[in-house]
Amino acid sequence: MPKLITAAERLILAREFIQKARDYPLPIDGGKYDFSYIAQVKDLLRQARDMVKYLPHSAGAGTIIKSDALRILQEADLADKEILH
C-alpha cells in the first residue's frame, strides 16, 4: 500500500517540482524549442499541479493550506509561461 502524503508534504513536493522545472537544463540543440525539453518541463509542472489540485476543495485542509495550494497552482502556470514562452 502506498504511503499517504500529508497536505504540507504535498505543498513542499509541488514547490520542488516547480523548482526542478525552472532548473532543468536547456539543450544545446534547439534550445527551449526542443520537444524533449518541452515535454520534461511540462511533465514536472503537471506533477506539481497534481500534488495540490484537490487541496483547495478538501474539507480537511485549513484555510492556510488551501490558499498555499491555490498559490502553487498559479505559480505553476506562471512558471510555464516564463520557461516555455
For each feature predicted by the language model, list its residue ranges.
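Long, charged/polar, soluble alpha-helical segments
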Residues: M1-H85
